[in-house]
């Protein structure tokens, strides 16, 4: 229910009550540097987990496109399996053409990376998206920056090839606080 915290998502509550209270007392136009950021670059995913839906998994989208909307499904009433969640389509097919992803990377370079305490990449499947690998590369190329940051990905660890898992293991060594 709405008053419960998922035991599947390991960090559902990220802000302390005093942080929320402080934010309500600040002027609306104050510049605020985030301490925690959860980001999804894309919904591309290779699995159709029972707790997921088309908004977060292209495998679910493919299933609905092939067989149609689910009938007589018991759900929370949000209609997740009635369509393919077209609103979740990426703004562009290639990362370099997506203005939102480009804006994120610019923000990252212009101070976010130096102030963030935690970044969590969700999906879809994060290791299927170039944006995740771009952050791993950034940590490799900037070993003096982002030392205080926790870097977590919500991965199913089921890559399409074993080489991708090997790459993840190799790249994770360059991130000081990888979870």
Please describe what each predicted stretch is.
Residues 104-105, 132-141, 164-170:
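Short, well-ordered amphipathic alpha-helices
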Residues 1-35, 55:
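Flexible, acidic/Gly-rich N-terminal and inter-domain linker regions that tether
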Residues 34-44, 55-99, 114-130, 142-164, ...:
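Core AdoMet radical
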Residues 37, 104-107, 115, 135:
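Alpha-helical packing segments of well-folded alpha/beta enzyme cores
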Residues 11, 16, 82, 137-140:
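Compositionally biased, low-structure terminal segments
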Residues 27, 86, 106-107, 137, ...:
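Residues in intrinsically disordered, low-complexity segments of regulatory proteins
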Residues 16-30, 96-110, 163-168:
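A Trp-anchored, charged/polar loop motif used as the substrate-binding/catalytic surface
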Residues 1, 44-55:
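Local cysteine-cluster metal-coordination motifs and their immediate loop/turn environment
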């Amino acid at each position: 229910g709405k008053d419960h915290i998922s035991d599947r998502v390991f960090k559902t509550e990220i802000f302390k009550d005093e942080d929320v209270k402080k934010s309500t007392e600040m002027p609306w136009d104050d510049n605020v540097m985030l301490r925690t950021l959860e980001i999804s670059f894309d919904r591309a995913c290779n699995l159709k987990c029972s707790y997921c839906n088309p908004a977060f998994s292209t495998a679910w989208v493919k299933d609905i496109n092939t067989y149609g909307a689910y009938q007589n499904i018991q759900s929370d009433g949000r209609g997740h399996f009635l369509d393919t969640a077209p609103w979740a389509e990426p703004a562009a097919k290639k990362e370099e053409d997506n203005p939102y992803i480009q804006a994120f990377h610019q923000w990252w370079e212009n101070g976010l990376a130096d102030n963030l305490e935690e970044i969590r990449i969700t999906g879809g499947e994060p290791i299927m998206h170039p944006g995740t690998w771009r952050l791993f590369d950034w940590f490799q190329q900037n070993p003096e920056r982002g030392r205080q940051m926790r870097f977590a990905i919500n991965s199913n660890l089921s890559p399409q090839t074993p080489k991708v898992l090997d790459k993840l293991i190799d790249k994770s060594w360059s991130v000081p606080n990888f979870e």
